[in-house]
């Protein structure tokens, strides 16, 4: 409601939507660059809505990262016209780096988790969904022809890094940031094999899944895994619905989030088994910390309330990896 009541926020939101649509529908690099600059300037007031120091710091980090990406985008897109220059040979790679920086993809992901940890859940939702639409569309529709091998290697790195580092986090917003990095790996793999429509479909499913999750976490003021215990005080319907969203986000069959991953597996199975293996390994690690969040949200039964919690945690350290690894066996059998 605060966005509607404030004229500044209403203007920022409308400009944010229009600038993204302009960028997606653009047929000119300069027009695309201008639309993405307008998008950047529109999102910063939304990030700083509560005027606290943490959100201001996150907005500054976001501005610096996106400004660097915009500079690389402008330089590379204009230099590609100069076919006689030796520098123009490196411009497609520079353009790729600019888009990956704006997307928050490996190896240009340095700003993304820290910004996510500094802003509100509503801003996190916009940053993880709407703000990725324009760079992801460019990545899917314009760039894969000359960068297939590079994109596949970056997709594998996204999946691995998102899973490995995400397992060591306790802050929910940081976990969701590394989860997003892992999902970017799956989207990039679809873009690399010339399936842009499948890439966008995966992105739409991802946005549908994170929207109720982020909104609920923001409503309940949950910022750490220990705050997940608040869910047990609400109705069992809300609790179970959020747990199902988490499992779906992890790609567990037969939930909705498994469908785009199954589609990716079928597309990559014939000729890119190594990349597929790495993607599945990263997805299993993602599922590990989703299960960790789910267990944190479950209340202990009465007969276990007097049991030492360290004993339970030690046993879960063995149970969770075994359960998570067993869930990933079926794709390997298909290979």
From Swiss-Prot:
- Keyword Transmembrane found: yes
- Give the catalysed reaction(s), semicolon-separated: a ubiquinone + NADH + 5 H(+)(in) = a ubiquinol + NAD(+) + 4 H(+)(out)
> What Gene Ontology cellular component terms go with this record?
mitochondrial inner membrane
Task: Write out the GO MF terms.
Answer: NADH dehydrogenase (ubiquinone) activity
Membrane topology is: Multi-pass membrane protein
Q: Which UniProt keywords apply?
A: Electron transport, Membrane, Mitochondrion, Mitochondrion inner membrane, NAD, Respiratory chain, Translocase, Transmembrane, Transmembrane helix, Transport, Ubiquinone
Q: Write the Enzyme Commission number(s) for this entry.
A: 7.1.1.2
Could you tell me the Gene Ontology terms of the biological process aspect for this record?
mitochondrial electron transport, NADH to ubiquinone
Question: Membrane-spanning residues where?
Answer: 7-27, 28-48, 58-78, 81-101, 110-130, 147-167, 174-194, 200-220, 240-260, 274-294, 315-335
Where in or outside the cell? Mitochondrion inner membrane
What does the UniProt function comment say about this protein? Core subunit of the mitochondrial membrane respiratory chain NADH dehydrogenase (Complex I) that is believed to belong to the minimal assembly required for catalysis. Complex I functions in the transfer of electrons from NADH to the respiratory chain. The immediate electron acceptor for the enzyme is believed to be ubiquinone.
> What family does this chain come from, according to its entry?
Belongs to the complex I subunit 2 family.
Q: What is this protein called?
A: NADH-ubiquinone oxidoreductase chain 2
Taxonomic source organism: Lumbricus terrestris (Common earthworm)
């Amino acid at each position: 409601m605060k966005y509607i009541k404030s004229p500044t926020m209403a203007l920022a939101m409308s400009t944010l939507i229009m600038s993204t649509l302009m960028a997606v529908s653009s047929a000119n690099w300069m027009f695309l660059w201008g639309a993405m600059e307008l998008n950047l300037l529109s999102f910063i007031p939304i990030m700083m809505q509560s005027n606290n120091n943490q959100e201001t710091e996150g907005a500054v980090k976001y501005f610096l990262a996106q400004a660097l990406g915009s500079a690389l985008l402008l330089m590379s897109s204009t230099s590609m016209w100069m076919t006689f220059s030796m520098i123009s040979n490196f411009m497609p790679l520079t353009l790729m780096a600019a888009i990956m920086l704006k997307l928050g993809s490996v190896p240009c992901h340095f700003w993304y988790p820290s910004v996510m940890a500094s802003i509100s859940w509503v801003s996190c939702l916009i940053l993880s969904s709407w703000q990725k639409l324009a760079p992801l569309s460019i990545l899917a529709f314009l760039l894969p022809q000359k960068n297939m091998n590079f994109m596949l290697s970056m997709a594998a790195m996204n999946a691995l890094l998102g899973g490995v580092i995400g397992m060591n986090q306790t802050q929910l917003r940081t976990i969701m940031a590394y989860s997003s990095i892992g999902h970017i790996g799956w989207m990039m793999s679809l873009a690399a094999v010339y399936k842009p429509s499948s890439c966008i479909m995966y992105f739409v499913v991802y946005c549908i899944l994170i929207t109720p999750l982020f909104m609920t976490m923001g409503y309940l003021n949950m910022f750490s895994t220990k705050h997940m215990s608040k869910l047990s005080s609400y109705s069992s319907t809300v609790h179970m619905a959020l747990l199902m969203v988490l499992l779906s986000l992890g790609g567990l069959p037969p939930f909705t989030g498994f469908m785009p991953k199954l589609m990716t597996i079928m597309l990559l199975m014939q000729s890119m088994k190594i990349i597929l293996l790495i993607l599945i390994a990263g997805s299993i690690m993602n599922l590990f910390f989703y299960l960790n969040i789910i267990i944190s949200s479950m209340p202990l039964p009465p007969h276990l309330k007097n049991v030492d919690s360290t004993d339970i945690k030690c046993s879960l350290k063995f149970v969770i990896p075994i359960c998570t690894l067993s869930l990933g066996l079926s794709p390997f059998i298909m290979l």
